[in-house]
Structures are given as structure tokens and as C-alpha cells.
């Protein structure tokens, strides 16, 4: 291998990433960066490796360096925001996702992550707005995940009929999603539709017999029948 060719090191690193060999991949990216320190793609890819290793602070440093060389590097902004979100730095993460949306106003990933940040900050109305904006964009990509967080937000807002509606739409594409079915069962119970809720939780018992939240819900339903 040509040790002085940064592109060869870079592509070797990308291949190693495909096999989840992140430490080896980072060595390749480091070798590439020694030759060309301004390689924004190598910096970004090194950050990706660090994300997989859950080394979020170091990953953010790599993404910042990549952004320094390429201020409109959408994926670097997106993954910096994700690293901040996973580090519970939700307000800083929101700034990154806004940068993504400035570059691409139809980024469903950014809207989804924004909704999750707002939810964790307790701003349910903003979270719901992001979900609805994401769902208004054409295409099914991420729709199940967006509908799930939308259902969680609506549940916290006490809008149980809307939770049921959102969950039903999501379940059309993902009928085996336990979390969605659990949310729907909770919404049915809290909306006073106890028999419908009971039929659904009986199905869920067969899927996850050890879920204590499910047994609490069953007890709640039986108290009201």
C-alpha cells in the first residue's frame, strides 16, 4: 500500500468500518490525517468511529474540525447534534439540528432529533410541531420512529384519541412494534376504552411476559371494568 497516499488510508478505514473494526479504522483515518490534516471526510469518519465507541466528547471534536474545513458539512452537523443529544446536552444539540435544517430544510433526521430534544426538555408543543413538520415531508423514511415519538408526546399531553390514531398509522408499516402497541393500549385505557385495551394487552403478555409496566396497566384496566 502507498503509505503516502491519504485516499488509500481513507478508503481502507471505510472498509474496516463496514466490518465494525473501529479502532483499526481510526488508525487509518489518523494516518490519512497525518498526510492531509484538512481532510474533512477523514475527520468526519473518525468521528463516526468514536460515536460507535460511545466516545461522544472526542467525536464532537472531530465533527467540529470537519465543520471548520467545511461549514456546510450537513452530516457533520447532524452527528455533532446527535452526539450532544446522547450526552444529554439537548439545547446545544438543537443548535446543530437547526444548522442542518438551514442547509436542508427537509431533513427528517434533524426534525426527528429536534422533536426528541424538545421532549426531553419538557417542551411538548415544540416536539409535536417538529413531528408534524417531519411527517408532512414526502417519503416513509423514519415515519415509524417519528410517529412513535409523536405518540409519546401526545400521551404526555393527554390527547389519547390522537395517540391511538398516530399509533394505528405507525402500526400499519410496523405491526410488530411492541412499544407502539403498548402506547396504544395505554391510550385506550386512559380514554376509557377498557375492553379494547384489555384485548391488546393480552396479546402483549405473550410477547413480553416480564414487562412490569404491562402488568400495572392490566391491573389498572381490571380495576375499571
List PLM regions with ranges.
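Helix-start (N-cap) detector for alpha-helical repeat units in TPR-like alpha-solenoids
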Residues: 6-7, 40-41, 74-75, 108-109, ...
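Conserved structural position within tetratricopeptide repeats
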Residues: 30-34, 64-68, 98-102, 135-136, ...
Amino acid at each position: 500500500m502507498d503509505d503516502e497516499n491519504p485516499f488509500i488510508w481513507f478508503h481502507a478505514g471505510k472498509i474496516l468500518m463496514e466490518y465494525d473494526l473501529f479502532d483499526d479504522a481510526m488508525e487509518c483515518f489518523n494516518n490519512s490525517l497525518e498526510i492531509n490534516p484538512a481532510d474533512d471526510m477523514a475527520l468526519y469518519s473518525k468521528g463516526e468511529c468514536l460515536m460507535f465507541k460511545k466516545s461522544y466528547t472526542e467525536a464532537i471534536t472531530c465533527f467540529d474540525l470537519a465543520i471548520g474545513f467545511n461549514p456546510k458539512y450537513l452530516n457533520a452537523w447532524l452527528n455533532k447534534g446527535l452526539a450532544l443529544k446522547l450526552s444529554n446536552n439537548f439545547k446545544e444539540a438543537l443548535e446543530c439540528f437547526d444548522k442542518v435544517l438551514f442547509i436542508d430544510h427537509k431533513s427528517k433526521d434533524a426534525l426527528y432529533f429536534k422533536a426528541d430534544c424538545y421532549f426531553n426538555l419538557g417542551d411538548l408543543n415544540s416536539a409535536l410541531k417538529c413531528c408534524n413538520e417531519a411527517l408532512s415531508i414526502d417519503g416513509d423514511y423514519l415515519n415509524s420512529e417519528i410517529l412513535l415519538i409523536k405518540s409519546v408526546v401526545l400521551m404526555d399531553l393527554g390527547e389519547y384519541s390522537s395517540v391511538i390514531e398516530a399509533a394505528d398509522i405507525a402500526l400499519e408499516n410496523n405491526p410488530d412494534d411492541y412499544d407502539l402497541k403498548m402506547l396504544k393500549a395505554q391510550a385506550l385505557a386512559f380514554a376509557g376504552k377498557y375492553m379494547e385495551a384489555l384485548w391488546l394487552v393480552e396479546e402483549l403478555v405473550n410477547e413480553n411476559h416480564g414487562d412490569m409496566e404491562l402488568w400495572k396497566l392490566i391491573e389498572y384496566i381490571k380495576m375499571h371494568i
